[in-house]
Amino acid sequence: MLNLIEQWFALLMLLYLTSGLTGFLAGDSPFHVWRLEDNPLLLAIQAVMYGITLGFVVLHWRKFIGALRASGWVLALALLALASTLWSSDPAFTLRRSLVVVATTVFGIYFGSRYPLPQQLRMLAWTFILLATLSAVCALLLPQYGIDKQLHRGDWQGILGQKNLLGKAMLVGIVVFWSAKGILPRVLRMAGLLLCAALMLMSGSRAAPMVLAALLVLTAGYRILRARMTTLVPLTILLLGTGIGAVFFIVRHRAFLLGLLGREVTLTGRTKIWTAVWGAISSHLMFGYGFSGFWAGLHGESARVSAMLGFVARHAHNGFLDLWLELGIAGLALFAFGYLQALSNGLRLLRMGPHRLASWPLQYFAFMLLYDLAEGPILRQNNLYWALYVAVVVSAAEAVSVGRQLRDGSLAYAGPRCKTREQQPDHLPRRTAGRLGNLHSETGRSVA
């Protein structure tokens, strides 16, 4: 019974982190995005959700402690955000928000260590089904809330309050349902894919379809990554050469290509924002302005950027620039080290089995990298995408660790400290015996 309650809570927490359930409670001020802490109801909901999370962390403290090593870089980045209170331009605000971002990171570690990858995808699938259904109902029955009537008239925003947020969520939903082959019933998976795709198109977001197209191209590349080294090396060189040529072509003809997509060369003003924030970055190069310490509307340092732009910017529309503004080169370095380590684990996991589940971590890491080039921010409190990143980092590291133990045959002699053989298949993608062997053979042999 307790396990069932815990699963329902995890599902509710994932939905809460989308901000879809609480968006209507934030108020009507155009600047409420910076001061949600002023809403007592939101603070109470936040305290309850993270309080329950802490209770489950304590209940499974051994798993949680074991996952801390796998989460080292992401936890260090969250703790740097907390430490930035010492030099923040708004220390009290930074302290409040950094405490919540640490709590969000803790939930990600708990979720990634508590549930194996197949179960995570099942929970995420139901999360996005609920999110997509509620957004469709909101747009159709409550169009004054669910459809943009101002800046982007006619574009759907659902319960998320902004068309790009809906497009981003539905993109992740598509990746989840695609990766859940063999985990969800086929009918449910196809229905989820179609619903998320329809809402992504109705949102009018341009970034989401472009990132989806890039992810589809990468999907074909994942098959190549499973090839033998004698095949992999020349194919990698060929693809790298092709990719470099494509980049040069895109840069050279960017105006024409963006015109085909209905975009300006400035990417709807994004390049102007990027140029404007460079001056602010250079004056706080190493440690930034503190977590959530820069963008404050017409107050503080962000007022100068807004004056240069002629409008009030809420973020840099680039996750890496936002991270640099808030935590400086130190924050960027921590994220880069953690991302590269996670990417390495994702590649190892991919080569362990052909199941689509094995490609989920790489798909999510690619989504993070591509989407944060034009949107932002990366590190954010009460944010589903940061919590999922932490969970995927932990899950991929643990899956690779179990795979390495299977390869070395150490699980047979490790005693009660190791996961039992019945638990092991949940952490690694299943595969049938073939050229690369069987990950879960009775003899404990792994792929070679």
Regions picked out by a protein language model, each given a short descriptive name:
Residues M1-L82, S113-R122, W126, K181-V187, ...:
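Transmembrane signal-anchor hairpin modules in multi-pass inner-membrane enzymes, especially those
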Residues L15, V137-P143, M202-S203, R223-V265, ...:
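A membrane-periplasm/extracellular boundary helix in multi-pass inner-membrane enzymes
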Residues L42-L43, A70-L79, D90-S113, W126, ...:
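Aromatic-anchored transmembrane helix interface
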Residues A47-K63, L171-K181, I329-R351:
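Hydrophobic, aromatic-rich transmembrane alpha-helices
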Residues Y50-T53, A81-A83, R122-L151, L160-I224, ...:
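Alpha-helical transmembrane segments of multi-pass inner-membrane proteins
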Residues S113, L188, G221, L327-L369, ...:
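Hydrophobic transmembrane alpha-helices and their immediate junctions
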